Design a protein with these regions (language model features):
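Flexible phosphate-sensing "switch/lid" loops adjacent to ATP/NTP-binding sites
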Residues: 1-328, 336-347, 355, 361-368, ...
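Cysteine-nucleophile active-site neighborhood
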Residues: 11-17, 21-25, 29, 317, ...
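Pocket-forming structural segment of enzyme catalytic cores
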Residues: 70-79, 336-337, 388-499, 535-537
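C-terminal cap of thioredoxin/glutaredoxin-like
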Residues: 164-166, 507, 525, 529-533
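Short, contiguous acidic/charged loop-to-helix segments that flank catalytic cores in large enzymes
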Residues: 301-304, 353-358, 464-468, 517-524
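Active-site beta-strand termini and strand-to-loop segments that position acidic
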Residues: 501-506
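Short FAD-binding loop at a beta-strand-to-alpha-helix junction that anchors the flavin cofactor
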Residues: 508-514
Length: 538
């Protein structure tokens, strides 16, 4: 068993998650069984109650874990499913230790940060390694080395280095200030100094910068950080994140890591990277472009736009576009400031979300798509709003609404799941939604059925997608919606919950209560996203 810790220096948001995912990809291409863990030093037990603009998208695992968005990057790069155990938080560690103390499992000892908290961290890491039968485990430590909350995790990493085969990869920012015109290495030197003060010497430094570093700067980092120059790896600005594994391989990073771990190369078969490179090159080309709008409420943060709230939706669009030979131009539309100046946009996606903010803007967008034959894909909340819009403007139920938006609506076409009522009443919000993968039975002959069949994902008319919601289409309104032309393409196996809807005689008007973006990757696009993008090209 071998472990690779990925740490960060200088500033957060450098792309440690993409670095970790890229290393996973290239090591898997060498024939190794790999997996990854994300450590988040916040005190929340999981990411389920975090605001998307606070910490990015909540990634939902197959078994229903609400985790950090970086697990999404890991899954997309290795094309494998992870679990909630792959996301460790300070809250989760302390919760477990306190539970054990209350049960008397420490046999009366004084419970301390060292060894009890550090042992719990190491045990969580080792348990994931054992459960997945992995040969190499990557552990990304969120934040930066200088964060107070990271100290205990770095101490656990230091201890593990004495017990197992461990490599340390440090990701550092090397700025090139416009007025100075040269890369500055001093911040990297300082972050490595902090790391060494904690007993950790990095084996590799990934230099995140605007462009590749020259030999002069690499020599300087090598000297002051006591690291071989060949282990200083370039991570320049790139057009698509899927290019990074290829950039790392050009620098022989996988071979260097395996040598450091005293592991032999299992294979030189890079066929999967060839296909990866082909799809990546499509996303970089300038000629064949499709313009797609994503309407959301978690886009703005202060005076800036941050797409991380919908990162999986954005990536799923890219996967489908690459499969079809196109590069997407994504237009982010703030639903609280909607302007229906959309003629140049070839298709619209309304992703998931919660609450009442920006709802009317999304409803106006759906009306525009339905009436103007603009391809539309609704996800989770997107399905619910598509139903509300249809009920109001086609079925004549002018006050139709969701009880999440208006508790007193006379026509609750969207209502809370029965099993969720007491949960909400008692304010038990964490990890209590309809979470994880669920089956749906598809109706033969529908667009949805044909798309899943095209990708060979149907067995006995059943498909599986991940979910995260409390509200559903109210069964009392099934008949009036269907009588007015809405097609229910898929139900839960018991026939109670509508999982997919579509409109006939429309270029593409499809919505799902699920989150198909969570099962999409560069080599295997989501059928719904594929169908949506394909319709945008017609």
């Amino acid at each position: 068993m071998a472990y690779i810790f990925v740490t960060g220096g200088i500033i957060s948001g450098l792309g440690k998650g993409i670095v970790t995912a890229s290393i996973l990809r290239i090591l898997k291409s060498r024939g190794y069984k790999v997996t990854a863990i994300k450590i988040d030093p916040y005190v929340n037990v999981d990411a389920g109650t975090l605001r998307p603009t606070e910490h990015g998208e909540v990634w939902v695992t197959e078994e229903g874990g609400e985790t950090d968005e970086d697990l999404g990057h890991y899954e997309r790069f290795i094309c494998e499913s992870l679990t909630k155990d792959h996301n460790i938080t300070t809250g989760k560690i302390y919760y477990s230790v306190i539970e054990k103390e209350r049960k008397g499992e420490y046999l009366g000892k004084t419970v301390q940060l060292i060894p009890h908290i550090t042992d719990e961290i190491k045990n969580c890491i080792k348990n994931v390694a054992e459960k997945t039968n992995s040969e190499i485990v990557l552990i990304e430590i969120g934040g930066i080395v200088g964060d107070y909350e990271n100290i205990i995790f770095l101490e656990a990493a230091r201890q593990l280095n004495r017990e197992e085969k461990v490599v340390f990869v440090h990701v550092s920012y090397v700025p090139i200030p416009n007025k100075l015109g040269e890369p500055k290495t001093k911040p990297t030197q300082q972050s490595v100094k902090l790391l060494r003060e904690l007993g950790i010497q990095p084996d590799f430094i990934i230099c995140r910068s605007r462009e590749n570093l020259d030999e002069v700067r690499k020599q300087k980092i090598s000297l002051f950080c006591d690291i071989p120059k060949e282990n200083i790896i370039d991570d320049p600005d790139i057009e698509t994140v899927y290019e990074l594994p290829l950039i790392f391989e050009k620098q022989n990073l996988s071979k260097k890591i395996l040598n450091k771990l005293n592991l032999s190369e299992k294979t030189t078969n890079f066929l999967d990277l060839k296909e990866w490179e082909e799809r990546t090159n499509i996303l970089k080309q300038k000629d064949r472009i499709v313009k797609i709008g994503i309407v959301g409420k978690y886009i703005g943060t202060g005076n800036f736009k941050l797409a991380d709230s919908y990162i999986s939706v954005e990536e799923a669009v890219k996967h489908a576009c690459a499969f079809l030979g196109y590069r997407p131009e994504i237009v982010w539309i703030d639903s609280t400031r909607i302007e229906l100046n959309l003629p140049k946009i070839q298709g619209i996606i309304i992703p998931g979300g919660f609450g009442t903010t920006g709802i009317e803007g999304k409803l106006k967008t759906i009306t525009y798509c339905r009436e103007n034959n603009i391809p539309f894909l609704g996800l989770c909340l997107g399905l619910q709003l598509a139903v509300i819009e249809f009920a109001r403007n086609v079925c004549g139920l002018k006050d139709a609404n969701s009880t999440e938006i208006d508790e007193n609506t006379k026509n609750p076409v969207i209502d809370i799941l029965p099993e969720q009522r007491d949960i909400i009443k008692n304010k038990k919000y964490g990890a209590t939604m309809r979470l994880g993968v669920y089956p749906a039975v598809l109706k033969e002959g529908t667009k949805v059925y044909k798309l899943y069949k095209k990708f060979n994902l149907i067995k006995n008319n059943i498909i599986f997608e991940r979910h995260r919601h409390r509200y559903e289409l109210n069964p009392e309104y099934h008949k009036i919606l269907q009588n007015n032309g809405m097609i229910f393409s898929g139900f839960s196996p018991d026939g109670k919950l509508v999982e997919f809807i579509e409109l006939p005689n429309h270029k593409f008007f499809v919505a799902t209560q699920a989150h198909p973006e969570f099962k999409s990757n560069l080599l295997n696009p989501s059928p719904l996203f594929y169908g949506f993008v394909e319709s945008c090209l017609k």
